[in-house]
Amino acid sequence: MLSDLKQNLRSYFSSRILILALAIASIISVCTTFYVISLEAKNFSTIIGFLLIDLAIFLILGILLTQKFFTKNNDNDSSKLQNRIVIAFSLVAAIPTIIVSVFSVYFFNLSVKAWFDKKISTVLDQSVIVAETYIAEHKVQLKETALAVAEDLSDMYYDLIHNPALFTKTLNTEADMRSLDEAIVLNKSTNTIVANSYLSFSLSFATIPAHLIKKADLGEPVEVKSDPTTIRMLIKLKEYNDVYLLVGRLVDNKIIDHIDATNGAAAEYNSLKNEIDNIQIKFSIMFIFIALLLLFVAINFGVLFTAKIVKPIKKLVTATDKVKDGDLTVQVPENEVDKDEIGTLYAAFNRMIKQLSRQQRDLVIAQRAMAWSDVAKKVAHEIKNPLTPILLASERLLKKFSSEINEKSEFESYLKMIIRHTNDIKNIVSEFVLFARLPAPKFTKSELVYLVKHIIEARKLLNDNIVYTYDSNVDQFDFMCDATQINQVMINVLKNAEESIEGQEFGKIDVILDAKDDFISVIVMDNGKGFPPELIGKATESYVTTSSKGMGVGLAIVKRIVEEHCGVLDIANREDEGAIIDIKFDLKELHLKVRRSGG
């Protein structure tokens, strides 16, 4: 059995660890898949492989969770509730997730279409075209200017070729007149600057690509791209030998920045537009995996949550089945549940079972008492009739013939024995009658302290070999009761104590009256032989006795009277010697009963 328990525990924890490991692996796998999809250099075989791994992990996780749940609950009828709750949790998680997923994908696609609408693409393209047109127009104007300056310089060839100062002055005049930011005349053969305007930057043929110089040799202006903020044109001067004119015009920085921003935005927009399919795939995959993960979490949470709810209900169902089979000793553990509705239900169930057990016990006792009551009536009737003539005949024989018989002492002894045993039988019959015909109490206001003390004094006179003590925390106490029946209670209890002391050298009976809150107790303690342990729980049942002088109805009568007065009779043995009988009356209940009865 111990090995089976270890095996079950090992299997339980291994399955939980496996499920936890798979859950962690699923999260790592999804994140890795997303990373692989996000890479610029995509390997679709790798992406498909990771997607298959994700799907396999989720399928295994789902199978394990389903198997764990349904295997645990398959053989138990009470698991139907747990199954319904888990299914409800799954539906509550799945339906909104599916709805949100569908609408999210739908609105995401709508949003993407709105972002990459044709109108937006047209606006961006037009912006780029406007920017390019602006630059192109500047280039065309600069080309025309370069041709015009080259023409002027060629016309003045003979005046300028041998006069560098005039060449420089003429070049500056052309630059000022045509709004050029720079103008440079370069000699290719000597790689020197022949003339330049005042604000021109130093430049040599080494910085101009060879293929541009070849194009310039054809006589057409060629654009030289060396600085994004300046447009430059290179043209060969016709009349000069290997001499070239380089003119340039600055472009406003704000315009350059605006053009760069426009081109950058357009390029990024087109890049995103080309990647839109991949973005949609990423979003859909991530949303599907997150939805599945949420579904599995909801199922697992449903299993744990329902286990917490259904487990105490199962215990309650099991306990109810035991009660149905007649076991009224069963109790459900209240300390294992929270102090909520389940805890309240547990407490109510335990109270109900205790009450049923007590009522069943009382019913058995009442049925037994009723049966014995019927027997008592018949026996008392049958015995009482011959008792009186026997007793009278014995007394007359003793009176009439005791003086005439020689063996007088033996004759008297025999007759007295007959009389004594006849009286014993008569007392037994009286007990039978009293038990069978115990009337309902007639409640009147009585002074309890006086009643108890009066009975103690009477018992002292009958038993001078027993020491009686009395103690009370009240001097006077008005008590609603049937005084005759309370007298009977005290007499029976004290008589029971006296009989247990018989045969001892020193006997002592302590009587304590204790009034506290809404209760008053009458406690009787003796130093006798006490009750046999096996009879403690049965001492108040009818015809259970340890005495040879009665039929065991004394304490049964006491119990009936005490209960009629809303009290409880508690019987126990003292630790050292003797017994203790505690009679405790509930004054609130007693007053309510008296009020209901019209007393």
UniProtKB/Swiss-Prot annotation:
It is a multi-pass membrane protein. It is found in: Cell membrane. It comes from Rickettsia prowazekii (strain Madrid E). The modification Phosphohistidine is found at H381. The keyword Membrane applies. The keyword Nucleotide-binding applies. CDD domains: HAMP, HisKA. This is Putative sensor histidine kinase NtrY-like.
